[in-house]
Amino acid sequence: GTAGESEAAGFFGPELKMAGFDAIVFQGRSEKPVYLRVTGGKAEIKDATHISDLGAREVEDAIRDEMGSAKVRVAQTGLAGMNRVRFANITNNLGHFNGRNGFGALMGSKNLRAVAALGTEKLAFENLQFLRDTAREFTRTFKENPIGEQLFVYGTTAFAEILSAAGALPVNNFRRSSLDDAAPVS
């Protein structure tokens, strides 16, 4: 037992909220492969035996067909996760990945192939205009900053030199905290 975290971009989180959930806790292990369908404030465990050996795109297509909407957001582990490969990812909408801590393997250990969310509620914001203004300002500042541009183009590896110099670069699963020459990585 340990704790871990991982985050991914995309729209799965907002869709989960619009489906009526802030969070979901999974306990135990299913006897057979399953996926969780969440919509309209209800959660339903569905048999996933028919999709357990499919690739990610086929799984997403099958779940969307079953739920009757192309708007369904799917977070899933792949075959590596179902086989409990320790560094397996979770992908949502085939382009955003929770790659840290092997959470795909955690899903596989529970025989959980996917979580599918279809929102039916609108998100409510206390001050929507403030949120919009803040998002625009953040985006503008980010685009104008050369580091922000590097982050957009190269991802988090843009910070490899800075992190290495600070002794905060995770190398070999944190066995080391810097590289002798981080420049080629950045």
Positions of predicted regions on the chain:
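Intrinsically disordered, low-complexity segments enriched in small residues
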Residues: 1-7, 11-186
